[in-house]
Amino acid sequence: MDTQRNILLLALALVSFLLFQQWQVETNPQQPATVSTVQQTHKNGDVPTSSTANSDAPVDSAQSDKLITITTDVLTLKVDTLGGDIIESVLNKYDAELDSKAKFVLLKNDADHSYIAQSGLIGPQGIDSNTGRAQFTAKKTDYVLADGQNELRIPLTLEKNGITYTKTLIVKRDSYAIDVEYTVNNQSSAPATVEMYANLKQNLLDDGGSLTMPTYRGGAYSTEDTRYKKYSFDDMEDKNLSIDMTNGQGWAGMLQHYFASAWIPRNVNDATLTTRVAGDYGYIGVRMPSVTIPAGQEDTLTATLWTGPKLQPQMAATAKYLDLSVDYGWLWFIASPLHKLLSFIQSIVGNWGLAIMILTFIVRGAMYPLTKAQYTSMAKMRMLQPKLAAMRERIGDDRQRMSQEMMELYKKEKVNPLGGCLPIVLQMPIFISLYWALMESVELRHAPFFGWITDLSAQDPYYILPLLMGASMFLIQKMSPTTVTDPMQQKIMTFIPVMFTVFFLWFPAGLVLYWLVSNVVTLIQQTLIYRALEKKGLHSK
């Protein structure tokens, strides 16, 4: 087993990994929605049916004639006074495209796509139903979080049948979490029973992943019993979920690359997570238990909406397991610490590209004992080649005897035949973990390195890094002694750097940078190890 065969093994592992990711995308397709007209914010099916009897009494179904704009340092929201739904969220610190003046819009409601956050009250004294939504009034149409102000409250009010309903949206500085409070002041002569719900509504969309950048767009949720689970639009079409959220713990959300929206119930001992499909829309959300408010009293029901980038520390502080929406796959236990280390390094050096380079040196340094063992094992195997050749000549076609004597020779010479490839196999989880850590890090979105690399999350526009990476692989091959004599195998080995280069043309520049620096470290380590082996007589140029 030599370096070139290890490279072949690595190539096969990488190809298998990429094909597996693409298989996941293709075996979990989402059906694209056909939208020919402007989508309305409210339509039949938006409001769930209450568990309380007589819940679908008609309410005011007047169309909205006013939108409210709420601006903070990180968010610009548009709220429809009909229902008080958030129909648009603009992320003020994230450009829509690199160097674009327009900001990224997460929630929106237009002709091409509808993705909004709904909440309301249902039940006998509820103000929302499938026949109409509550028409709130507000004192202003524009609310701005002023400099030095840490919190802003936006009240929407409605009076009906002796009951005052106040829906208050609470935004805070440097926060993508929005608290939504329903205060029900019952000044009627009878008890009032209401039930709060909070949904995310979105068109049924195709996942949109690719071979080199598999992404997920669909639902996800967390409960006390299930820390994190994706629930795609196809899943919603197949089965409506209704899951008890023990102790009111958990969240229901919709995810996409780098960004997420999620509803979190607050201050309840029980809640229900629900999904459904109505027409061209998928819904995922939470339902709070019904509350009965005696005459002359009031009560408040609360939920929190996260609508923003997948920033793990802030998400973890907002809701338990919400940070798991940054999905590192089955190697999360490796990827998560790597991301934390990468973020720590970046906080010191101030550049994500430099942080990736330093992280590469740290990872490769930690794996140096494996690398040294790999090259030492390969050198010993090469030293045994003359004896193995003589053994084959002497034994002939008796495979059983050949295998037996080979194992005896390995034992006598203290050589592990798998010692050359095992370190490569052990390194693959590191590569895959780094792949997901870089792929899922919103911090790398539009993050520059230097020169022509202005976005580490996108491919190199001039393909310079992939070409340098391919050249470094070619140098590693040329510097590595080989026992491969079969012409076909030699051609395959020569083709491996070309194949890797082609694959990496469309990989994010940050990942290609990691691989390039890793190859440079390999060349340095290879030179040092070979010099040490030469002194021991285990390697010859």
From Swiss-Prot:
Residues 34-55 have a biased composition (Polar residues). It is a multi-pass membrane protein. GO terms for molecular function: membrane insertase activity. GO terms for cellular component: plasma membrane. Keywords: Cell inner membrane, Cell membrane, Chaperone, Membrane, Protein transport, Transmembrane, Transmembrane helix, Transport. Gene3D superfamilies: 2.70.98.90. It is found in: Cell inner membrane. One of its GO terms (biological process) is protein insertion into membrane. The chain crosses the membrane at residues 7-27, 343-363, 418-438, 456-476, 495-515. Residues 34-59 are annotated as: Disordered. Coiled coil: none annotated. InterPro entries: Membr_insert_YidC, Membr_insert_YidC_N, YidC/ALB3/OXA1/COX18, YidC/Oxa/ALB_C, YidC_ALB_C, YidC_periplasmic_sf. It holds the Pfam family 60KD_IMP. Belongs to the OXA1/ALB3/YidC family. Type 1 subfamily. PANTHER family: CYTOCHROME C OXIDASE ASSEMBLY PROTEIN COX18, MITOCHONDRIAL, OXA1. Interacts with the Sec translocase complex via SecD. Specifically interacts with transmembrane segments of nascent integral membrane proteins during membrane integration. Required for the insertion and/or proper folding and/or complex formation of integral membrane proteins into the membrane. Involved in integration of membrane proteins that insert both dependently and independently of the Sec translocase complex, as well as at least some lipoproteins. Aids folding of multispanning membrane proteins. This is Membrane protein insertase YidC. It comes from Aliivibrio salmonicida (strain LFI1238) (Vibrio salmonicida (strain LFI1238)).
